[in-house]
Every structure is written in C-alpha cells, then in structure tokens.
Amino acid sequence: MKKTTQLKQMILSTQLEFLMEAHSGMSAKIVEEAGFKGIWGSGLSISGSLGVRDNNEASWTQILDVLEFMSDATTVPILMDGDTGFGNFNNMRRLVKKLEQIDIAGVCIEDKIFPKTNSFLRDGAQPLADIKEFCGKIKAGKDIQKDDDFVIVARVEAFIAGWGLKEALKRAEAYRQAGADAILMHSKLSNACEIFDFMNEWGNRAPIAIVPTKYYTTPTEEFRKHNISLAIWANHIFRGSIQKMQEIAQQ
C-alpha cells in the first residue's frame, strides 16, 4: 500500500491513531521498528539536530534532505511538520511537489507568519496569518498534488495566540472548506480543556489531530471519548536522545 494511502487511512480511521516524532533516517527506522504506523517529521527536532533554532533557520531544502533519508529508511508514512509552508502559496505549491517526489505522505502547515515562532515560547508574540491568505495556501497545495491520497493538515494556532474558542472554530471551518484533509488543533495549556471544548462544538466535520506535549498527563482514553483521530508525540525521541548523549559524554 502506498505511504500516502496508509496515512490517509489513519486519519480517516474511527480509531485513535498515533504518530511518533523522528528527525533522521536512524530515528525514523527505530520508530517504525517500535511498531508505530506513522512518523511525524518534526521541524523542531530536525532543526535541533542540525544545531539551529525552530524558527526556519534551516531552509526548507535542508529539511527535505533529512526527510528523504527518513523516507528511504522506512516503509511507514511520514507527515512533515511544514511550519508555515515556508512562504506564500507559490512556496506551498513547490513544497508539495517536492514532497511527493521523495515519497512523503503529507504535510502539516500552521496559520502563522513566516518565519514561524515556536508555539511554546514564553511571552513570545504569536501573530496569526490572515484566514483568506492561509486558505489560499491550502488550495494551492491541493491543486498541485498529483496523488489524491496526499494529505494536507491545517494547524490552528488560535488557542496558542490567546484568541479563544470562537476564533479556533472559525479558522478550522474555513480551512476545512479550503480543502484541508484534517485539522490539527494546538494548545499550550497543561490540561486538555481547550481541545475538548473545541471537539464538543466541532462534532465530526473533519478529522482532528492533536499534539499533547503540554497536556501529556491526559489519559489517551479521553482523546478517544472526544473522537480525536490522531495524536502526535512531537519531540520525544529527540529529547530522549539528547539526555542519553549528555549522560554518556559526561561519563
């Protein structure tokens, strides 16, 4: 089965599915061998492994070089963390074209301004993109893709920016209508109340993905109860590897 089809089926599944982060060919292979059905190509982790910050200091072509090694090393699908799409709608078109060439199954883009700001920076400004402009990126990506199963996930940062539930729903619906295959709803609270409030209003309009980095103590059964489709463990492999390298080096 094609990697794109595998990812599409995961997103459309009635069961909660999981992606684990990887940032190199080796880490991607480890994730697959651990039994994960898909991989999150984390922008933070890839940037960190290259020794740069998570704000587009690494170029998109440098990120794609790493993703190609990851794709070649594995048989499971990879969803790329595409930040803001690395520019405007033209950049998005070229990004999708290149991702398909290296057998990446999908891309997630967030509704922020390029260059992106990490969502968890303390007291950091979180300017959001214009809704119409971001919808244009989604449409551009869907128009250029050749594989019908290639997935575009729209990441909503309204909660991160402090704009509330109403804005989150407004943006998610606009992105769904623009053609997004799924919505990633992000939150920086230490509990999942914003996510669950959103799900109660959203219903089943489109599949929802989450990144429970901050609310990691929430039982996964609660995600199932709220009909969440995909949970992404976004940087666990990278953080764990840093700790082990530090321990070995200090010995």
Pin down the residues of each PLM region:
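Alpha/beta enzyme core
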Residues: 2-229, 233, 240-246
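Short, intrinsically disordered, charge-balanced linker/junction segments flanking boundaries
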Residues: 249-251
